[in-house]
C-alpha cells in the first residue's frame, strides 16, 4: 500500500508539468509514483499517457495526495502508441511552460526536479538534459553494459526538463517509430544550438539485471532496427560500413 495522505501540504510545488508515457508497465509506474512525495520539488501537473491494452488503476491514496497539494492529475488512455506519440500528446495537453519527462524504466533522485529547475533559472537556459546511470550487478549485464551504455551516466531524454517553447524551434517527436525518436529529437536540439544546462543529478535504470543476455541483445537489435530509419543515425551506419569494409580489405590482403 502506498501512503500518500501523510505528506504535508507545505511541500514545494512548482508550475511544472511532469509527462510520463507508460505501456504495460503498471507496477513500474506505481513504483515511480511512490517516489514523487519524497521529491524536494513536486510538479503541479502530472500527465500519464497510458497506451496499455488495459487501463491502469491509480491508487486512491495517490489521487488524495494530488488533491491535497492541488496537483492536477491527468490520465490519458490510448492504445498502441509509440513513445514519441505518447510524449506529443502529453506536450499538447500540458498547461505549464516548463515540462519534465520521465518513463517507467528510469528513477530520479529526490533532488532531480529541484536541481534541474534551478539550473535552468540560474543559467537562463532552455532546459537540462537527463543523465542516466545503467545499473548492472550480474555478470552478463555488466558485459552487456560495457558493450553498450558504459559504466558512467550518459545523456538521455528521460530525465530532461525543458521550456515548452523549445518544441516550437525543434518540432515534436516522430510518432511512427518504436525507438530512437528521442535521439532524433536531441540531435535536432543540438543542430539548433539550443542552450542547455548540464545536469547535476542522475537517474537510475535498473532493468538490465532482470533480463537475460539473450533478452537484452534481442531488445538492443530491435531498437536499433527501428532507429536505423532515422536521419540522425546515418553517421552510425557510415561508421559501421567503413569499419567493416576496412576489416574486409585487411582480411583479403592477408
PLM features: residue spans?
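Short, acidic, metal-binding catalytic loop of nucleotide-sugar glycosyltransferases
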Residues: 34-43
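A conserved acidic beta->alpha catalytic loop
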Residues: 35, 50-60, 106-107
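Short beta-strand/loop segment that forms part of the nucleotide-sugar
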Residues: 44-54, 76-79
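Glycine-rich, basic loop-to-helix element that forms the pyrophosphate-binding segment
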Residues: 78-94
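Short aromatic/hydrophobic "clamp" motif used to bind/position activated sugar donors
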Residues: 99
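Conserved donor NDP-sugar-binding/catalytic core segment of glycosyltransferases
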Residues: 111-140
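A recurrent flexible, glycine/aromatic-enriched loop bordering the glycosyltransferase active site
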Residues: 134, 145-162, 178, 204, ...
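Catalytic donor/gating beta->alpha subdomain of glycosyltransferases that bind UDP-sugars
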Residues: 174-179, 183-234
Amino acid at each position: 500500500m502506498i501512503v500518500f495522505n501523510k505528506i504535508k501540504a507545505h511541500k514545494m510545488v512548482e508550475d511544472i508539468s511532469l509527462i510520463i508515457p507508460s505501456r504495460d508497465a503498471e507496477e513500474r509506474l506505481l513504483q515511480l509514483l511512490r517516489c514523487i512525495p519524497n521529491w524536494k520539488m513536486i510538479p503541479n501537473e502530472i500527465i500519464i499517457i497510458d497506451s496499455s491494452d488495459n487501463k491502469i488503476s491509480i491508487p486512491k491514496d495517490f489521487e488524495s495526495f494530488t488533491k491535497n497539494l492541488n496537483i492536477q492529475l491527468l490520465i490519458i488512455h490510448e492504445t498502441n502508441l509509440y513513445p514519441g506519440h505518447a510524449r506529443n500528446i502529453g506536450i499538447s495537453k500540458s498547461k505549464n511552460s516548463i515540462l519534465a519527462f520521465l518513463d517507467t524504466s528510469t528513477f530520479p533522485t529526490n533532488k532531480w526536479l529541484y536541481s534541474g529547475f534551478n539550473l535552468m533559472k540560474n543559467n537562463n537556459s532552455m532546459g537540462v538534459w537527463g543523465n542516466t546511470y545503467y545499473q548492472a550487478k550480474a555478470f552478463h549485464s555488466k558485459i552487456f553494459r560495457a558493450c553498450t551504455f558504459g559504466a558512467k551516466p550518459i545523456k538521455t531524454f528521460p530525465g530532461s526538463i525543458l521550456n515548452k517553447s523549445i518544441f516550437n524551434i525543434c518540432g515534436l517527436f516522430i510518432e511512427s517509430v518504436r525507438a530512437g525518436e528521442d535521439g532524433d529529437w536531441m540531435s535536432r536540439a543540438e543542430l539548433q544550438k539550443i542552450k542547455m544546462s548540464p545536469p547535476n543529478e542522475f537517474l537510475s535504470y535498473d532493468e538490465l539485471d532482470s533480463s537475460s543476455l539473450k533478452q537484452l541483445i534481442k531488445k538492443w537489435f530491435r531498437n536499433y532496427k527501428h532507429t536505423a530509419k532515422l536521419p540522425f543515425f546515418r553517421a552510425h551506419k557510415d561508421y559501421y560500413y567503413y569499419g567493416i569494409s576496412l576489416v574486409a580489405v585487411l582480411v583479403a590482403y592477408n
